[in-house]
From Swiss-Prot:
UniProt-recorded name of the protein: Arginine--tRNA ligase
Listed Pfam families: Arg_tRNA_synt_N, DALR_1, tRNA-synt_1d
Protein's organism: Campylobacter jejuni subsp. jejuni serotype O:23/36 (strain 81-176)
Entry EC number(s): 6.1.1.19
Gene: argS
One term under GO cellular component: cytoplasm
An MF annotation (GO) of this entry: ATP binding
Annotated family: Belongs to the class-I aminoacyl-tRNA synthetase family.
Record motif 'HIGH' region, residues: 113-123
Signal peptide: none
Subunit text: Monomer.
Record keywords: Aminoacyl-tRNA synthetase, ATP-binding, Cytoplasm, Ligase, Nucleotide-binding, Protein biosynthesis
Domain of life of the native organism: Bacteria
Primary subcellular site in the record, as a coarse category: cytoplasm
Amino acid sequence: MKSIIFNEIKKILECDFALENPKDKNLAHFATPLAFSLAKELKKSPMLIASDLASKFQNHDCFELVEAVNGYLNFRISKTFLNELANQALTNPNDFTKGEKKQESFLLEYVSANPTGPLHIGHARGAVFGDTLTRLARHLGYKFDTEYYVNDAGNQIYLLGLSILLSVKENILHENVEYPEQYYKGEYIADLAKEAFEKFGKEFFSEENIPSLADWAKDKMLVLIKQNLEQVKIKIDSYVSERSYYDALNATLESLKEHKGIYEQEGKIWLASSQKGDEKDRVIIREDGRGTYLAADIVYHKDKMSRGYGKCINIWGADHHGYIPRMKAAMEFLGFDSNNLEIILAQMVSLLKDGEPYKMSKRAGNFILMSDVVDEIGSDALRYIFLSKKCDTHLEFDISDLQKEDSSNPVYYINYAHARIHQVFAKAGKKIDDVMKADLQSLNQDGVNLLFEALNLKAVLNDAFEARALQKIPDYLKNLAANFHKFYNENKVVGSANENDLLKLFSLVALSIKTAFSLMGIEAKNKMEH
């Protein structure tokens, strides 16, 4: 709606201007401070200029009122125009707020957790954010592909194999074993050990078979990770292996050398990242000739940046913050625009239950498993809470609040608004088709403002995507639900003289809730279950 109004205003003003959303919708739905920027050029006061501009909008179909207020030009949308937009939305509900196909393309790499165990709650935040960003981008018309980078070549994979070997020796063969400082523990390792022993037999469990054991376990963990993701309605387009990039390492090093991006010192090869803003240079090839994790990651990013996407986006854990300058430096040395590599950081999550820290999973050792939390509160509540705050800010929540059936549980509160609307239609014995001819002229100002809010979802979605600020969607839904509940409590609907106008208004509110929830990966309920 905002873009439509902007274009209508631009036809008359014939110049560029900023269009703002005033908080008090009783004063205006939109406003522009254009008169202030014209004051110097026209040598007039902003108030006079705004008054002159307002006079150009007399008898415009889109606006009920256009007036100058303290130098601002305020616009209130007409009921007739809002009704036209409502008819379009209700006639084609599946296309509501959808964007036209755009030329811009994106590649999102996210989750990319080491395939050494099930997903924990820290992985879940970036996973939910990435999936919602994907849904939103595609809904708005962007080409948006997703990828999971499988770290299947590093020391972590070897440690997985070693941990299983030691578990077999200790718990099945009852041998005395000495555990290294770093290893994987938890019930899932014991389960893998038992399964591996049954599959491979006693003779297999020697140090020389650790790589084979690690490969087998890695594949099992990748299947488990995909199941964890499916549990929260996430499907990633492609999984790429770190190992598959090994053959491209030498060519990448040659390219870096040509661009003076690397040098040799102390028997190691260093990335000269300090030249590009990093705090120091970084080792990419060790003294023994083995590449560091950074080396493999540079090769992978070179490939991603070469595929023709307008922008490559990564979602990383906040602990990778220091990794950003070195990766951007490498891309610049390789001739890419580092602005086309966008990094979104997912901050830490603190989980409580009844005010106390949530217990770590026995299955995973020292982590809270994502699947455990989903089992307790469901996928919808988990997704909502992870989207309720900006991704790069710390998030703390008590899962007990998400099990309540009252306004303190935002998922329940918003769903209750959606279910309530279905209940009202049932009580009135009507369907949406029965109210399509209502013209909404009888709506009071609160009703008009609620309708405006429901129809303004597209602007919220655009803002959320462009700013990567997905919390704008749950914020919008909370306000919409609160305003609906207030309006419903203050206005008689079934049996009133303007029943059809109110039901049509409510159907728009329900459509906005359903659309926004769908983009968040949440199901809008038609009926609340107790």
